[in-house]
Amino acid sequence: MGRQMADAVTRRRAAAVAGHRGDAAAARSFLADPEPSVRATALGALARARSLATADLVAALADPSAVVRARAAELAANLPGDVDPVLGPVLDDADASVVEAAAWASGERRPPEPGVVAALATVTTGHDDPICREAAVAALGAIGDPTGLPAVLAATTDRPAVRRRAVLALAPFDGPEVEAALERALTDRDWQVRQAAEDVSR
C-alpha cells in the first residue's frame, strides 16, 4: 500500500471514529479532504453524530466524485421529501451508482419529494443501466403514486431482475391492468418473477 493510500485509510478511519464518538467538529473537518472516500465517510460520521446539515448534503450532491454524491443521496433517505436536498435532478446523474442511490433514497423519503415520481418513471423506462431501472421501479412501488403505474407496468416486460422488482412494485396498485400484468407474471419464464407474482397475488 502506498504512502498516500495509507494516509487516506488513516484519515477515513479517523472520520469514522469521530462519528462514533459524536465528535461533530472532527468529523466535519474531513468534508474538505482531498480523498473522496474520506469525504464520503465524513458525511456518514456526521449523520451518526446527528450533526449532518442539509447544506452538507446539498454541497456533497455537487461533489466531483460519484462516491461522495452517492453517499449523500443515500443519507438523504432519512429526510422528508418536501425539504432539501432535492433528489430529482440527481436521478439524471452521469454515474449509475449515484442514480441507483438517489432512486433508492427517493423511495424511502416520506412524504415523497414533489415531482420525483416523474423522474423515477423516466429512469425506470429509459435508463441504460438495469440496476438503475430496478432501483427506480422499486421506488415507484414504495411511493405508490398512481402516476407512476404506467412505468411500473412497462417494467414488467424488462429483463428478469427488473421484472421481478416491477411485479413486487405492483403491490400498492389495483385495476385491470395490474391484474393482467400479474397474470402474465405468474407464467414468466423466470422463477423469481413467478414467485414475486404469487406473493403479490396472495
Describe the function of each predicted region:
Residues 2-21, 29, 37-51, 56-59, ...:
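Structural detector for internal amphipathic alpha-helices that build alpha-solenoid repeat scaffolds
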